[in-house]
Amino acid sequence: MNVAILLAAGKGERMSENVPKQFLEIEGRMLFEYPLSTFLKSEAIDGVVIVTRREWFEVVEKRVFHEKVLGIVEGGDTRSQSVRSALEFLEKFSPSYVLVHDSARPFLRKKHVSEVLRRARETGAATLALKNSDALVRVENDRIEYIPRKGVYRILTPQAFSYEILKKAHENGGEWADDTEPVQKLGVKIALVEGDPLCFKVTFKEDLELARIIAREWERIP
């Protein structure tokens, strides 16, 4: 059984909106509904768990009607806490693999879901990633230090893992920017799957405007 964990518990404070960004509506759908739709259509996914804050349960319940949705789980104050809540909920389902995705990355393709899961079956863990094409610098005390671009990737989601591996990685708590970090500390090789620029994370208002433009054509994008 392959289960997608859709993280939608963030507060979206950098967006400066009245509601968390995952619940902002673009082209008739809330942001979280775009990746959710991809998971529901994907033949590689058997079930979906949506993690959100308690005060948004009713909103999510009204928007979600599908047999693949296994449940809505209350998220924590941090990303890692939300992942652990989902893993605990999933114990009764005994999934083989779980796929973790940020709902603030609305434009998820089915081919990426399938490929990340395929690579995770080979190594135990895989993540979507994108080669960096920009100049990178580190700034300290007003001094700029250039970082070589070769071998530098942006880590994206979705990320897929053996359920048992991810559960073990989180069993001692800890706070992580994403889930590949604690998994790698177990000695598990992380497979990288090439993503594309459409996998961007909606963080600022400018990102939301770009998302609106893409959303108008999303159903036509293969």
Curated annotation (Swiss-Prot):
<feature type="site" description="Positions MEP for the nucleophilic attack">
    <location>
        <position position="201"/>
    </location>
</feature>
<protein>
    <recommendedName>
        <fullName>2-C-methyl-D-erythritol 4-phosphate cytidylyltransferase</fullName>
        <ecNumber>2.7.7.60</ecNumber>
    </recommendedName>
</protein>
<comment type="similarity">
    <text>Belongs to the IspD/TarI cytidylyltransferase family. IspD subfamily.</text>
</comment>
<dbReference type="InterPro" id="IPR034683">
    <property type="entry name" value="IspD/TarI"/>
</dbReference>
<dbReference type="InterPro" id="IPR001228">
    <property type="entry name" value="IspD"/>
</dbReference>
<dbReference type="GO" id="GO:0070567">
    <property type="term" value="F:cytidylyltransferase activity"/>
</dbReference>
<dbReference type="Pfam" id="PF01128">
    <property type="entry name" value="IspD"/>
</dbReference>
<feature type="site" description="Positions MEP for the nucleophilic attack">
    <location>
        <position position="149"/>
    </location>
</feature>
<comment type="function">
    <text>Catalyzes the formation of 4-diphosphocytidyl-2-C-methyl-D-erythritol from CTP and 2-C-methyl-D-erythritol 4-phosphate (MEP).</text>
</comment>
<feature type="site" description="Transition state stabilizer">
    <location>
        <position position="14"/>
    </location>
</feature>
<dbReference type="InterPro" id="IPR018294">
    <property type="entry name" value="ISPD_synthase_CS"/>
</dbReference>
<dbReference type="GO" id="GO:0019288">
    <property type="term" value="P:isopentenyl diphosphate biosynthetic process, methylerythritol 4-phosphate pathway"/>
</dbReference>
<dbReference type="InterPro" id="IPR029044">
    <property type="entry name" value="Nucleotide-diphossugar_trans"/>
</dbReference>
<keyword id="KW-0808">Transferase</keyword>
<feature type="site" description="Transition state stabilizer">
    <location>
        <position position="21"/>
    </location>
</feature>
<keyword id="KW-0548">Nucleotidyltransferase</keyword>
<keyword id="KW-0414">Isoprene biosynthesis</keyword>
<comment type="pathway">
    <text>Isoprenoid biosynthesis; isopentenyl diphosphate biosynthesis via DXP pathway; isopentenyl diphosphate from 1-deoxy-D-xylulose 5-phosphate: step 2/6.</text>
</comment>
<dbReference type="GO" id="GO:0050518">
    <property type="term" value="F:2-C-methyl-D-erythritol 4-phosphate cytidylyltransferase activity"/>
</dbReference>
<dbReference type="GO" id="GO:0005829">
    <property type="term" value="C:cytosol"/>
</dbReference>
